[in-house]
């Protein structure tokens, strides 16, 4: 049995799920850290946003690779 078509989209879906889990963990840790030490918000917020950007970049790269490989 041979599979054709949208297997690359399954890979993108897995990349998006991984990215979503990563973003959830990043902001859960950020909220937990700010709840424990509110004065550390100015230090933790840029780190959380950088982590968010890197996690979302992986999802965007997964989407790009899904379309490039599929073409």
From Swiss-Prot:
Identify this protein by name: ATP synthase subunit c
Q: Which residues form a coiled coil?
A: none
On the tree of life, the source organism's domain of life is Bacteria
Swiss-Prot/TrEMBL site (Reversibly protonated during proton transport) positions: 56
Task: Output the Gene Ontology terms for molecular function.
Answer: lipid binding; proton-transporting ATP synthase activity, rotational mechanism
Recorded GO cellular component terms are: plasma membrane; proton-transporting ATP synthase complex; proton-transporting two-sector ATPase complex, proton-transporting domain
Which family is this protein grouped under?
Belongs to the ATPase C chain family.
Q: What transmembrane ranges does the database entry give?
A: 9-29, 49-69
Cross-referenced Gene3D superfamilies: F1F0 ATP synthase subunit C
Q: Where in the cell is it found?
A: Cell membrane
The annotated topology with respect to the bilayer is:
Multi-pass membrane protein
Matching entries from Pfam families are given as: ATP-synt_C
Q: Do you know which SUPFAM superfamilies this protein is assigned to?
A: F1F0 ATP synthase subunit C (SSF81333)
- Which organism is the protein's source? Micrococcus luteus (strain ATCC 4698 / DSM 20030 / JCM 1464 / CCM 169 / CCUG 5858 / IAM 1056 / NBRC 3333 / NCIMB 9278 / NCTC 2665 / VKM Ac-2230)
